[in-house]
Amino acid sequence: MNKLIPLPREFFARDTNLVSTELIGKVLYFQGTTAIITETESYIGNDDPACHAARGRTKRTDVMFGPAGFSYVYLIYGMYHCLNFVTEDEGFPAATLIRGVYVISHNDLYTIYTAKVKSQITDEKTQSIIISEDRRSTKFDIPNLEESNLYLNGPGKLCKYLGINTTHNKCDLINNKDFFVSDIGLNLPYSTTKRIGITKGTDKLWRYIVTDNKNALLNINIL
């Protein structure tokens, strides 16, 4: 693999919408998996009703008030994790939500996923049934790992298959060899839309997604 270099903290310590747009086409590297970021959303400060920090500084949102370039990972509905990158100046709570990635290389995501499911169950017969049924599920569109490229659309799906959870909260993305963002010079076309999956602040055009992702991402190879 070509050597990937983490982005500097200065990249994240800027206007959140600028960071969100410029993250499109950047590489997310996480513990052996390399993926192109394809969809982001901005959550900005106390005046954004959809931003967790709108309710003030809490133990959960403390990382958002800290230095830029750290991960903010939280659990929603008791089952889905979401990955964010802290942005702006320290003291101003803001972050970019990573909503989608296109996997270029991986360390067998399906093996990782099934191992996690099996760890919750002791009966071997039940294990095999659950794994079999879940792989056929359309809810998460479980990918065929015989294909080298995988499109993970949705923050919960992204975290599930990459293995990102709350233990990866508050990770420094600048000084971390296993979890960082890199620039390989990709300039992908993207569209701007209203944010989705929220009930407040729905009028803000703070969602950015690669346009015609199938063609834009086809044949990308950084190995």
From Swiss-Prot:
Q: Which GO terms describe its biological process?
A: base-excision repair
| Residue ranges of coiled coil | none
Instruction: State the UniProt keywords alphabetically.
Output: DNA damage, DNA repair, Hydrolase
Q: Which domain of life is it from?
A: Bacteria
Cleavable signal peptide: none
InterPro entries named in the record: Formyl_transferase-like_C_sf, MPG, MPG_sf
Q: Name one GO molecular function term.
A: alkylbase DNA N-glycosylase activity
* Assigned EC number: 3.2.2.-
Listed NCBIfam families: 3mg, PRK00802.1-4
- Family under the similarity heading: Belongs to the DNA glycosylase MPG family.
* PANTHER family for this protein: DNA-3-METHYLADENINE GLYCOSYLASE (PTHR10429:SF0)
Any idea what this protein is called? Putative 3-methyladenine DNA glycosylase
